[in-house]
Structure formats: structure tokens, C-alpha cells
Amino acid sequence: MSSDLIEAGRGVRSPVEDVSGVMPSARGSRHHWAVMLAGGDGVRLQSLTLRIAGDSRPKQFCSIFGGESLLTQTRARLESLFHVDRELFVVTRAHETYYRDELRNVDDSRIISQPLNRGTGAAVAVALLHILQRDADAVVVFVPCDHYYSDTEAFGRAVRSAISGAEQNPNSIVILGAEAHYAEVEYGWIELGSAISDAPVPLLRVNRFWEKPSLPQARALLRRGCLWNTFVTVGRASTFVDLLCSQLPEVILSINAAMAENELEAAYRLMPTIDLFAARFGPSASSTVGGIRYDAGMDRS
């Protein structure tokens, strides 16, 4: 299915420059891509961003923890891990007032501006289709831009481990789970099971995702050693596409057809809003999703 989508998308202007002839650097393989997901509306924290920034901008464009915005902090965490031309940003057109300044030094070809916010399902799908036009062997890291990590070096090591895990297990999606330090009810949780692979990267099967559990449930998850879900998700682009074709066929097929006809806005207007990570990984977790445990001092805004 993924090869059919790549073929159907040919002829669409790529969002990234073709630099396949450039020699590799210390930033890892040129098949490694980072996609920063910055298209959310941030409705839950609008009252907070209003107090901090003086307007109701989405939280990724706000300095929630002081200093730089969450988006800028996310960029900084990834800059040593990926080639610059392999870093893409998925944003929403209505937020251009905010992201245009944040991304003023980023070439327009690396900014995927969605006509509307339709959740992570659409954001992941449109990014994958853009990448697969350029690199059929891509390994993609999807990173939400609404998290804070106190230990950026540990985060970088965890991302590298997740990439290695995805390369060792090409039919699996790998998700990072952060060590939980208290029974947080506003976070998603991951319950890990048996080992998928041990060396060199220990990868554990995800038995279940828990999205915003009750306090008694969160306490039980903490006692069982379950992890906070960072939603940092890694896998081969073709594996992601196969998952989307299985779980969200109407989304990825609609976007693929719309890209070929330059009718993306019309497709988005007809599309439901779907959170891929919260709603769609669960049914496939036992067979396709593995987790890596790490501790980088995560705090989700």
C-alpha cells in the first residue's frame, strides 16, 4: 500500500530540497527525518497563554516555562540529531501570525502548512506523504512541540535508541515512554510488556495505552512501573503508512489524492479531527508498537 501512495504522489512539489548527493555528517543518516508537530490549537491552556503572552496563542508558541517558546525548545533539542534539511514542521495556517516569526529562518520548503487543524492523524499523514516523495527508506521521528524536558542529553540518547530500535524492527513503531515520578492524571500512560528485542536496544511490547486515567488508576499504573507517554514516535515511513492505511484509510487516501490534485484544503474541510496517538495505536499495540523506557525529566504543558 505504501508504494502505491508514493507512486500516486509523484509530480507534487516536494517540501524539501533534494540533497541526496551531500556527504553525511555527524548528525546521523540522511534517511533520518524529524517532524515537529506544531499544528494544535492548544485550547486547554488558552487562559494560561493569555496571561503569559497577552493573547490566546497555542501553547507551542508560548514561553510556558520561561525563556524560549516550547517550539523553539523542541527545535534546539533536535538540532544535533538531524540534518537541517531533514527537519520538517507541520503547522496550521490560522497560526501563521505566531509561527512565521518563530520559523523566520526556516526555508518555506520545510514548513508544511495545513489548511485546518484536523488532529495528529492528518498531520502525520501529510508529513509522511511529503517525505516518501523524497526518501522511500526514511525513518521518521514525530515530536510533539508541547513538552518540556529538563535533560536534553538524555532525550537525545533516547531518540537515537528509538531510531535504532525502529531500524532493527522495521515492521514496528517505537514510542518513547518517560519514567513516571508521580500519579499524573493529565498525561497519557504506557503499559509495557514482554521484550520484542534485547540488543543492542531493549525494546518492549506496548500492552496498553492509558489516556488521562483516573487518580486511582494513575496510582496503580505508577506502582506497576508504567511510563508517561511522550508521544515521541519513531518508525519507517512505510511502516507508518501501512498503519495509517489500516487504522485511518479515509484520512491518508484522501490527503494523498488531494496532494496529487492540489486540492488539500477541500480534503481537510471534509475530514474529521482524529488524534492518531490517543485513539488509533491501542488496537494495534500488541503487534506493531514497541516502547523504550528512559528518564529525561519530562513535563507536558
What name fits each language-model region?
Residues 44, 96-98, 148-150, 182-185, ...:
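Short, active-site-adjacent cap segments at secondary-structure transitions
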Residues 24-29, 54, 80-82, 133-135, ...:
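Solvent-exposed alpha-helices and their adjacent loops that cap or buttress functional pockets
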Residues 42, 49, 75-82, 103, ...:
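Structural signal for hydrophobic packing residues in well-ordered secondary-structure cores
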Residues 117-122, 182-184, 215-216, 297-300:
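A short acidic, often aromatic-flanked loop/helix-cap motif at beta-alpha or helix-coil junctions
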Residues 2-58, 63-160:
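Conserved N-terminal catalytic core of the sugar/cofactor nucleotidyltransferase
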Residues 151-184:
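Conserved donor-nucleotide/metal-binding helix-loop-beta segment in metal-dependent transferases, i.e.
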